[in-house]
From Swiss-Prot:
One of its GO terms (biological process) is defense response. Residues 30-42 have a biased composition (Acidic residues). Expressed by the skin glands. The lineage of its organism: Eukaryota, Metazoa, Chordata, Craniata, Vertebrata. This is [Val1,Thr6]-bradykinyl-Gln,Ser. It comes from the Eukaryota.
Amino acid sequence: MSILKKSLFLVLFLGLVSFSICEEEKREAEEEENEDEIEEQSEEKKRFEPVPPGFTPFRQS
């Protein structure tokens, strides 16, 4: 009975460790995606910032 308890404990422990490693990798991947989205949004904001009044990109001579 003692051997059965030890092996069951070992299986559960290894499963828990494996699960926590997978969760950590998943969390890191989600953080990377969020950082990429934030970066893209800031680039879009920079592209479409309002132009100051009287500014013309092309000068007429």
